[in-house]
């Protein structure tokens, strides 16, 4: 992309951005760093600002999560990190020959008057909860993708990559050596985390699964004790009991935040949620709500210190292979042509990630999404020519669109409530390690799980259940067990019945409480999960229906 125009930036220091200068250059920056600091980054960019390959090296070696805007006379460098954890947007106004850059939520950029909705993209958004590639639902506005930066020199502007997630470029190696390397990577990452918080309290949303337990156990193994853990959900839910057992074994403070249908219903209609959604809106995904109620509760009750650093387990499960469709990938037919296999992969991916509403799925809508996904892959030199890299395209698409836009954007919760955050399982060396390991070591997270269980950090892995769930209250569990045999010949129909009539009462986080039970059981459009309703609510606020179309005015 080359053009001749001026860059105009909108940056606000009240949302965590700070400005520093060096000679004639200045740098707006937000984030945290393990191996450098803002001043060193500024000086390095100043010294290499005319050398594109050197700029790429500088950005690629920054270990941390950040957004930055560098300007010096006729040169500008605007970059996000490898997961776009702090989003930056841009808009090319061809009439005025201005290239606008926004570092804050576009809701706060009132000067630009950005209101026009991209109707084509909202149809994609309505089926997944996020957009494809650099697109947002605002016409003309783009999101700077993971690992990319804008480079302007002498009014010539281009968008470049310093990093591309390429899980199809596998490196064949043996499991014993990889397990040793993963052990070192984990210890190094958590050690960097501890050093970066400068003795401040670490607060961990601790589940009964792997990722947050890994962080908590290794933090303890490395001797850091200023740690608070919490869990949430319905009273006496099994996962919270596991969380409590882990925290007790590690000798960390632990809190429980109860979710009831009543308090969650009030939560979703509160000003807290509407204000947060305004703050966190990236116009490329539905806002992520998961920790908002609980962190706000802990803050109001003064159960965690004001200078706490929140550290969650995103997205260890994804990067280690837990989201890969094992059975599908292992059956991949390599006698078929590349185009036939690509078609199969995209069909499976769309079925998994673009199915929020059954009534929106049609041959036309699926083909439209498929075309957009294929178009977005045209600049990527992907490969799937070997059984060990057949997962590459599937994993890349989820990384770029779901993980980096939706899941990672959950860090806005902590910023909104006034806390710093860290994402140790998205650090450079963690990404680098898992990006290129063969499929056989990612399936069912076998390498990740085995390495962790072998080390048993903190003594919380072999005797405390992992990812086990028990449906409560027991009355609902009994009812489910009585009803399930009636659907013996159709597992799919049982799943639909269970979701529509029973999940409202037993889901531990009470995630369906944004709707009334009557609305749930009357729902005829075929919702997939609670994100279906979150996405509909997001679109409704913009005058759109659940399909992304403008609601007709009476």
What are these regions (language model features)?
Residues 1-206, 210-262:
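Cysteine-centered catalytic environments shared across enzyme families
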Residues 106, 315-317, 431:
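Short, glycine-/Ser/Thr-/acidic-enriched flexible segments
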Residues 145, 177, 181, 185, ...:
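Generic recognition of stable, solvent-exposed alpha-helical segments in well-folded globular domains
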Residues 235-298, 316-337, 435-439:
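ATP-dependent adenylate-handling ligase core
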Residues 295-366, 418-426:
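Active-site adenylate/phosphate-handling loop in enzymes that bind or generate adenylated species
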């Amino acid at each position: 992309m080359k053009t001749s125009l001026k860059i105009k930036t909108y940056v606000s220091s009240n949302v965590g951005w700070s400005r520093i200068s060096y000679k004639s250059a200045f740098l707006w920056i937000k984030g945290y760093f393990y191996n450098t600091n803002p001043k060193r980054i500024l000086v390095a960019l100043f010294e290499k600002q005319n050398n594109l390959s050197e700029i790429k090296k500088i950005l690629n070696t920054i270990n941390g999560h950040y957004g930055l805007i560098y300007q010096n006379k006729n040169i500008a460098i605007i970059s996000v990190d490898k997961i776009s954890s702090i989003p930056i947007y841009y808009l090319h106004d061809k009439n005025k020959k201005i290239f606008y850059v926004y570092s804050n939520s576009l809701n706060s950029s009132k000067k630009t008057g950005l209101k026009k909705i991209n109707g084509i993209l909202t149809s994609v958004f309505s089926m997944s909860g996020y957009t494809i590639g650099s697109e947002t639902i605002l016409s003309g506005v783009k999101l700077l993708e993971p690992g990319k930066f804008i480079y302007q020199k002498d009014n010539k502007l281009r968008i470049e990559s310093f990093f591309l997630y390429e899980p199809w470029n596998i490196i064949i190696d043996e499991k014993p050596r990889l397990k040793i390397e993963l052990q070192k990577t984990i210890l190094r990452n958590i050690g960097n985390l501890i050093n970066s918080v400068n003795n401040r309290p670490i607060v961990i949303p601790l589940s009964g699964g792997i990722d947050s337990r890994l962080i908590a156990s290794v933090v303890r193994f490395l001797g850091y004790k200023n740690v608070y853990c919490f869990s949430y959900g319905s009273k006496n839910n099994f996962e919270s009991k596991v969380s409590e057992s882990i925290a007790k074994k590690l000798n960390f403070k632990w809190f429980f935040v109860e979710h009831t249908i009543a308090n969650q219903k009030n939560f979703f209609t509160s000003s807290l949620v509407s204000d947060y959604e305004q703050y966190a809106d990236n116009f490329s995904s539905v806002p992520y709500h998961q920790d908002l109620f609980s962190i706000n509760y802990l803050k109001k009750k003064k159960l965690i210190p004001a200078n706490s650093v929140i550290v969650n387990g995103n997205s260890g499960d994804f990067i280690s292979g837990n989201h890969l469709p094992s059975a599908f990938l292992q059956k991949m037919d390599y006698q078929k042509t590349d185009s036939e296999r690509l078609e199969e992969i995209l069909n499976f991916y769309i079925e998994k990630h673009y199915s929020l509403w059954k009534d929106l799925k049609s041959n036309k809508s699926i083909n439209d999404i498929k075309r957009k996904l294929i178009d977005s892959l045209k600049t990527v030199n992907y490969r799937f020519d070997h059984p060990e890299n057949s997962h590459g395209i599937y994993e890349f698409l989820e990384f770029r669109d779901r993980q980096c836009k939706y899941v990672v954007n959950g860090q806005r919760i902590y910023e909104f409530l006034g806390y710093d955050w860290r994402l140790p399982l998205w650090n450079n060396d963690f990404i680098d390690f898992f990006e290129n390991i063969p499929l056989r070591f990612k399936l069912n997270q076998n390498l990740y799980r085995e390495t962790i269980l072998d080390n048993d950090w903190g003594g919380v892995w072999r005797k405390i259940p992992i990812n086990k769930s028990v449906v409560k209250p027991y009355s609902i569990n009994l009812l489910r067990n009585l009803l399930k045999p009636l659907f013996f010949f159709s597992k799919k129909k049982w799943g639909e019945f269970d979701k529509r009539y029973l999940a409202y009462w037993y889901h531990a986080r009470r995630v369906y409480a944004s709707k009334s039970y009557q609305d749930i059981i009357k729902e005829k459009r075929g919702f997939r999960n609670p994100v279906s309703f979150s996405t509909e609510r997001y679109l409704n606020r913009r005058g759109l229906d659940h399909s992304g179309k403008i609601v007709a005015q009476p």
